[in-house]
């Protein structure tokens, strides 16, 4: 045997994957192993219904015959050897947890048998190692045994050794040692069960003893049934009746018959239970009466009013077994239908499902009868003592378990002592303990059906209930009067707006304006004092939830499951109809296109309401959580309104809309999106601190349609002499209102005051100013604005904010888990009337516990846990909605997942029994009260309550809860602050282990303004934040800036540090490290992958080709299916930057490179902050500093070190210096801090003091430094590219490039116009952004200059030759070129997503070369005759693909196509032509595809006329003969604006969006590309042919091929031999201008004809020439040309004054003809660019004049 084999002895087996053996290595010890056969999977044989016989298929379980076969193989064997191949550490029964897979070799009768081969030969297994590994990673190989199965295996091992001759002590010791962990678990489980039984027995014994003591006390009792407030009166002993055991037995029999009473008796019991006195009941101590007569009375009527008015309640006399059943929930507590005297009716059958479903397809189920068992529970009279607090704000982004819960138990005990509630603990504690002990026992679910509704109607008809209804009416009147009193009091205390609290009162506005006069330096005008008129509110009931089922065919239940919930209140009580489809929103075509390019396909829940209300001119107030689409919820609609108002008043200069954002960063982002939405037609202007006043004033005077600014900026503009003209203002928007209300409330009030004054002077009083506000939270600042704004609509998606919006009473209790049920019961007892209550739990066992307790207390309960299916949910939803009772309110007990599906919105009370894991889930719970929240527009008070129960198991959510409580009330226990601080500290400590950096705002400003939504760290720890020894802690430091993160944060490499006159220079080791790493990784053997990355790993990554740098894994973004990390965030150690990478790009880094220091740190400029109370520095400030550094590369930075935290150095001075070596002097060129203070920043003296205080708390010495790793902003990740694809039928294409017939690239004709428009945008972008590409990697998508026409196009870097030269693949041309790195530019996300990459990789199907590869002559002939026609224009070819495979060069597919040339009298299949010309031979496997093309080929009409003026196609008439297949059979009929219902197997959904042409379009294309009848096939010659796209030619030395048939003569075209100069053309409605770009030309010939231009010249020994057929007719007499030196300018006058679609009649398909982008900006009266754009869009469709295409209607909409 080979060296990797070792001998084993088989002990036991279950299947080929589970074999236990003993390794025969030593006679003195026994070594066990768990083995499996590698690479085989089980198969199963089943009967084939289609063909006779058995069908084999893969299975997850081994067939029983496998064990029989293994038994036969293992019998009488001689030796067994094993060779390991794979080790798994997940499923072994032994302590080492090793499960080996390999091959078992059995030596039997002198023959070697391989177990895997025997299993495969027997048809019981199949060999597939790849699938084997996949199944193993997915857990489909079942090797994990249960405890019972493991115990059986160990028993079999012991049985085997009992039969062997080995010593018992030896094998028993080995078995025990190898299975010690399993046996320990068994003992632990046995101990747990034993303790549980002992605990239950102890509880039962104690309960029985207490009950017997109660019975003994009853012997001498003279009490009667007492109610609340009734005094205990002693009675005579003579009247006492002694109860004996016999009487107890009789009473138990009587009680068992109570349930057999009639419905009327049940009704009496029900009403008596709820309305008798104060609901008095007796405890277990008073469960017995004194005589048998009272027992008989109770057994007949169940409860009777005594003479003194108190009610006697039937007592439960239960033996020990019955008591255990009650407390352990083993007996189902539900409503049961009492037995009636009427004959038994037949059982009714029902079907569960939506109303529209076919009932024949669902199984019938017997309709459950309503059962109702009345059980009496002792009443617990508790003092109600709870504080009113609110709960919830934002979601927790850190899921951490708080481990030190013992500390919180002490705090909880202290809270319980302070908050003592006098409850009867014995009953509820025993109930709680019994529920916990039996939480895993199964309990039956509730079955509430329509019978419940029927019985409720019967109860209403009873006379007893009628009398109770009268009592209820009296009670309702009294409660209403009390509610009105409380509402009056609350309205007096609330902050509802009144005329006296007017937001713009004289005194308040005077103070605000005085403040602005002191703070603002610009002169101000005196303003008149006015008051905003009070707006009366209509007191009508408003629409709460606009999402209703409007589709009659859609199930109401399904609508509830899928429809979102949103609170909408309107001032005018108008109906708000949501719009769930993006196409139905009337934004206009241009905005819809931008939204699609941004990836917005559907509106969010908030946007379904906000877009429509804003477009209708209503004032809208949006309250929604972060990242829920608030900004995009108003911005597209506002931009549409701006465009509409601009068209109505084009001469106005003032803004139509003003958007106020809290930060300059938000202003820049809104400005970017607005410019995308509005384009070039509307003027968008952004204003923030630091901008030049002159440029701002100039921009406003030139006209502004949309003004975006910060609050301080808008106030300055309004107070300037040349201020903003508000006369044309129609919309005022406030974004980020949660911060504006805290910091800039006076500024917003001032703007509203100016708007009010403008409205008074406006002529048209009906034209109001629409107000739009977006905020994360509800602020008191919003309330007066909402009430005074015209036609207000409040839309709230953050449901926790509804508590503050409607001022709902909320209480929070922090208590022990065993006291929760008592607290719930106390809250439920306070509920009066038929109002609905929802109790939300976290787990199913909590649902069962609460349900049992409520039913025990005679409540109508609907329980819903995670085990319920769709039928149960539907049934529960129907019964919940149909439940009606004027005296009882139903209670829904459910989990969060069920609550979302049921979509309950009509509750009045909400109880949070336990908190969920996510805070967002907690916030969604508040939506159950959605229909009952009172409107802000009505002065009404509704009895809504929310109760939150907290215990020590939910303390991880306490910090956010506490933050919300402090917003609602001041009565928050201070002890909760201590608890919250400990929790936050422990969470930050857990973040340290995950390398989470300190908050950037905390380090830059000293505070984090958004702590609850920030995911970074906010505490400093000595262990992780102490600085390294080499980091400067004081003195003066010099450094070189590597990267600007912001205006005050930089990545830098240290140069020197001077302390007390001593200068320490840092060694520049980076170059040495880079050289060593380059030499190490230059060897292929050294490039080993890092493996599975973990947070904290240090490895290497390739930044450029053969350029490796060090990095550290700081975060894992995504994982593979097997759980291994895929995408990770890495920190570049030597650059202090963060990037994203994949695990396969990380390489192993030797230890010698890990410890080398390159002295790279982060530097922050301290003690300054942005102007105007901003929290972000603008991009303008950052760009100004970057320009200073870029102008002079010799500059270095110098600053004074104030303190250090981790790898971050804080400097309080920062200067840009220059060394004058000749003078040995250092001069300061720029003072960065002063530059910022002059225009962008203000001093912040508290910055460092706050950080120093945090350092002192953590134990760091303040002056000595502090530590922290600051994370720069990660490099943005570009979206995945999409590639164009061929359609299933014929596709019209251009041939882009050819490598050979097995690799060629085509591009679709239908996207040619879009490509031209995209290229114009790309080149305009590059001209405006001159910063070159900073670094590049192989595979990067960039913008590169195409050498043939010097135009920038999209490209991919395929190879890096050096730092100055790369090889690029142009993704739209399908060609490779060598490009200088100076000609590369960064690409934007829009350029990638705007249009798919156009190069489509193909090969010619059905042919193959004669040799191993294609000859150069064959490739050149193919290129010469398929690229261009006789006139030099690109040929319109057609392809039909038959195969599809993975592409070699692109990211799409590689198609096997047949190429069709229609430029002759008959359509020619180029594949067959190559075979006929002996340039290729047939591929036998694929030649049938060409035969199929021949059979289905359709001959098109030869005649195709061209409209001279319009450039469009005339009608196409089909020839009378030679038509085999009609056009409608070739192309499938597509619906109007159709979208594929099912994606292709290979193509993505994104690519389908570009299938915009229809069969009519292809019909026109066929006719358009029809050549003249005189054109013939050229003869094959050995002349010079064009070899590549660069125009280089080469002579082929091959001989002329013999003709296989009579071939036509070649048409000579000398023009093909001439070089084509680049032509830039432009036009307006009157003229066309051509720029022939040949610099330095002196002599040339140019001839202008009516519809042609011919040019020829010789320059630098190069012959140039062309002849163009123009799109339209020109006036030769008025045309002229001149030599401008750099180019020849040709100006031609059009005969018809209209725009051309292209320069030439065939379209601008030549690469050397481009549109002059410098002339795109036309005058406003001509609007040339806009017309050209619309014409290009129309040209995409290529429809003829007579077409009725639905796309024509679409184009009419565009126009």
From Swiss-Prot:
Keywords: ATP-binding, Chromosome, Cytoplasm, Developmental protein, Differentiation, Helicase, Hydrolase, Meiosis, Membrane, Nucleotide-binding, Nucleus, Repeat, RNA-mediated gene silencing, Spermatogenesis. It catalyses: ATP + H2O = ADP + phosphate + H(+). Residues 480-495 have a biased composition (Low complexity). GO terms for molecular function: ATP binding; ATP hydrolysis activity; nucleic acid binding; RNA helicase activity. Expressed in the yolk cells. Not detected in yolk granules. Residues 611-789 form the Helicase ATP-binding domain. Interacts (via Tudor domain 2) with Siwi. Component of the PET complex, at least composed of EXD1, SIWI, TDRD12 and piRNAs. This is Putative ATP-dependent RNA helicase TDRD12. It comes from Bombyx mori.
